[in-house]
Design a protein with these regions (language model features):
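Juxtamembrane regions of bacterial inner-membrane/periplasmic proteins
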Residues: 2-202
Length: 202
């Protein structure tokens, strides 16, 4: 009699454990499905943003220079941005190296995102339950500055990563660095190193 009761208890316990395991697995699958769906949606959004991007997208608001018949500058008409665009070969190598050294030492080795930096930042952010530390590469910064807002959210960050990877597929490293240097905001309405030097130093 006692053995029968023990067997029944064991069977009941096994059923409870099995039910709990199935429930947990089901919950995990649902969460994983929702998460995957969200990631795929953000990836799709990034591709849509990039669908109409061309070389002109990075210089379309540059300042127009007006010259007289002798080639002397007589006026500068600002676009939406105060931006004087420099081609890659017009940007000093020392300046390029400086930006890479300061902003993204592995710029020439990654494909738009730096996974080791992302993992390091993710651990710090999870600890604080919010985005406290960034891991943005030069390409990601370009993606954010050109195509996204400045909000600090996971959605924006993930979209930024997808856009960065698309940029790396479409443009060379030299082009990306050129776009970046020409579109950095230096305050007072100046975008890019040339506009900043013209504005601050004349």
């Amino acid at each position: 009699m006692a053995k029968d009761k023990t067997k029944k208890k064991n069977k009941t316990l096994k059923k409870i454990i099995l039910a709990v395991v199935i429930t947990l697995l089901g919950t995990l699958l649902i969460v994983a499905g929702v998460f995957l769906g969200k990631i795929l949606k953000l990836r799709s959004d990034a591709k849509k943003i990039m669908s109409n991007v061309s070389l002109d997208s990075f210089r379309q608001t540059e300042t127009s220079i007006i010259y007289d018949k002798n080639g002397k500058e007589i006026s500068a008409l600002s676009g939406i941005k105060e931006l004087y665009y420099l081609e890659s070969d017009e940007i000093p190598d020392v300046l390029k190296k400086m930006f890479v050294q300061i902003e993204d030492k592995d710029f020439y080795n990654h494909s738009g995102i730096d996974m080791s930096a992302i993992i390091r930042a993710a651990l710090a952010n999870v600890t604080h339950a919010s985005i406290k530390q960034g891991a943005s590469t030069i390409t990601q910064q370009l993606a954010k500055n050109m195509f996204l807002d400045q909000s600090i959210t996971w959605n924006r960050k993930i979209t930024e990563m997808f856009i960065a990877m698309e940029l790396e597929k479409r443009f060379s490293k030299d082009q990306i660095l050129e776009f970046y240097i020409n579109n950095i905001y230096f305050a007072n309405g100046y975008y890019g190193i040339e506009a900043a030097s013209e504005g601050y130093f004349g």
